[in-house]
């Protein structure tokens, strides 16, 4: 499976363009521009599984750092502050990782 099986390459490119400079990544804006926020819960969880490198069922800080690169391989890494903000936005139970349900809730919030 490729991420472009779910999201259009054009929408992904537009979303990445909006946050190409360090410290400009805004999760909700990215989810809207990429089309992710319009996807069903099932489709969002498919994207989650694609981002979950080690297939642990959770996204940790290292996986979040490379979040944008899962959408396009030559995208930049998230900065430390962007990674922390993304974690804080989704980690509802405070366990230091993001589960599939937490990710889906963040995308659709």
UniProtKB/Swiss-Prot annotation:
Ca(2+) 2 binds at residues 91, 93, 95, 97, 102. One of its GO terms (cellular component) is supramolecular fiber. The gene is Ocm. Keywords: Acetylation, Calcium, Metal-binding, Repeat. It comes from Rattus norvegicus. The modification N-acetylserine is found at residue 2. Transmembrane segments: none annotated. Found in tumor tissues and not detected in normal tissues. The keyword DNA-binding does not apply. This is Oncomodulin. Has some calmodulin-like activity with respect to enzyme activation and growth regulation. Binds two calcium ions. Ca(2+) 1 binds at residues 52, 54, 56, 58, 63. GO terms for molecular function: calcium ion binding; identical protein binding; protein homodimerization activity; protein-containing complex binding.
């Amino acid at each position: 499976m490729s991420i472009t099986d779910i999201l259009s390459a054009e929408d992904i490119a537009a979303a990445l363009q909006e946050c190409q400079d360090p410290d400009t990544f805004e999760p909700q804006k990215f989810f809207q521009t990429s089309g992710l926020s319009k996807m069903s819960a099932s489709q969002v969880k498919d994207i989650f599984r694609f981002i979950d490198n080690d297939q642990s069922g959770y996204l940790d800080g290292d996986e979040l750092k490379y979040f944008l690169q899962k959408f396009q391989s030559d995208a930049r890494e998230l900065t430390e502050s962007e990674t922390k903000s993304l974690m804080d936005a989704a980690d509802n139970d405070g366990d230091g990782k993001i589960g599939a349900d937490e990710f889906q809730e963040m995308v659709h919030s």
